[in-house]
């Protein structure tokens, strides 16, 4: 599951292919960046002459591996949702009346959602769906009240901060 999800997510930005020994090879512009094993083991291109651009891409891939490992690990050990209409989802986290859940399909990969749920957990409502794990974690933190929305930067504020740096 980990390797398939990594391949799906990396395929959008990099050239990927499986080799004969079970490694996912990742390259960009014909330059090999790394190889990833089914369990997330990572071997990067050790060429000392790689440009900063390609080193940045390798760092991006490592971040992607870390993120995918996080949610795949949570998913593999998470209980099924109690609510009948969403029983194909697994509960990754809950706080108060807010739940973060995920569903996986071979064809489409992961879909994440935050819901409000009743006290018994047998009914959910006001779903916020996304395939983006980072977005849904933030949505969960805000919707559950763990982080006040006013403490987050808007896209415009983030852009202004980046221009100042």
Language-model features and meaning:
Residues 1-21, 46-90:
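Negatively charged, low-complexity tracts enriched in Asp/Glu with abundant Ser/Thr
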Residues 23-27:
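A cross-family detector of function-defining hotspots
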Residues 32-38, 44:
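A structural microfeature
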Residues 38, 100-126, 161-165:
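Short aromatic-glycine-(Arg/Gly/Cys) micro-motifs in beta-strand/loop hairpins
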Residues 69-111, 149-154:
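Short N-terminal "domain-start" leader segments
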Residues 121-133, 148-150:
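A short, exposed loop/beta-hairpin motif centered on an aromatic-Gly-Thr core
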Residues 149-165:
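Charged/polar low-complexity intrinsically disordered segments, enriched in acidic residues
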């Amino acid at each position: 599951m980990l390797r398939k999800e990594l391949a799906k997510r990396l395929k959008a930005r990099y050239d990927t292919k499986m080799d004969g020994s079970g490694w996912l090879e990742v390259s960009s512009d014909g330059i090999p960046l790394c190889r990833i094993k089914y369990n997330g083991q990572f071997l990067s291109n050790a060429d000392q002459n790689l440009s900063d651009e390609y080193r940045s891409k390798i760092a991006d891939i490592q971040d992607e591996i870390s993120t995918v490992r996080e949610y795949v690990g949570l998913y593999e050990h998470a209980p099924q949702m109690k609510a009948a209409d969403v029983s194909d989802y697994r509960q990754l986290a809950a706080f108060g009346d807010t739940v973060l859940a995920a569903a996986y399909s071979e064809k489409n990969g992961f879909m994440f959602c935050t819901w409000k749920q009743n006290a018994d957990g047998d009914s959910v409502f006001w779903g916020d769906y996304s395939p983006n794990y980072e977005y849904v974690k933030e949505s969960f933190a805000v919707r559950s009240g763990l982080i006040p929305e006013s403490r987050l930067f808007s896209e415009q504020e983030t852009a202004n901060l980046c221009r100042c740096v």
